[in-house]
A protein has these predicted regions:
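PIN-domain endoribonuclease scaffold, especially VapC-family toxins
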Residues: 26-33, 38-86
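Active-site neighborhoods of divalent-metal-dependent phosphate/nucleic-acid chemistry enzymes
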Residues: 73-110
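Short, flexible helix/strand-to-coil boundary loops that buttress conserved ligand/catalytic motifs
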Residues: 15, 27, 48, 122-125
């Protein structure tokens, strides 16, 4: 299963224990393949630089990030760039369009996010959207 992941889900998994971290670990085990929009990777690094630059676990988080990126699939912006305007019109927050455009362009099996704008948008029929807990359950990886 190939799933596009958004920046907040990645950041949560890098810096905090919980379902998001379990999802990143599952990707390292090969239980699923995480798909990264180039815009999302850029956003993750920008947020780390801005908000986590003095976090006590920064080095460990950066090493974890490099591992999960290497285990996944990076989708270059040029592959989904033309789809961004169309998806921007379907979303309450146009800033979320690269995530959905990447899912569309890459043929991924869905998107994992905690972003309500993506989860609740009515214009995204055909693109499955999952909260992290739902996806872990679907994969048989949820905590009992």
């Amino acid at each position: 299963m190939q799933i596009v992941i958004d920046a907040n889900t990645i950041l949560s998994g890098l810096f905090f224990p919980g379902n998001e971290r379990r999802l990143l670990v599952a990707s390292l085990r090969g239980d699923l393949t995480l798909v990264y929009a180039e815009d999302v990777v850029d956003e993750v690094y920008a947020v780390i630089e801005r908000a986590f630059h003095d976090h006590p676990d920064l080095e460990e988080a950066l090493a974890r990030l490099e591992s999960v990126l290497a285990a996944g699939v990076l989708v270059e912006r040029r592959r989904y760039l033309n789809a961004i305007p169309r998806w921007s019109e379907q979303l309450r927050d146009p800033e979320d369009a690269p995530v959905v455009a990447c899912a569309d362009a890459s043929g991924a099996d869905g998107v994992v996010t905690g972003d309500r704008d993506i989860l609740e948008s009515r214009g995204l029929e055909g693109i499955p959207r999952y909260r992290t807990r739902e996806l872990l359950k679907l994969l048989g990886l949820a905590r009992k």
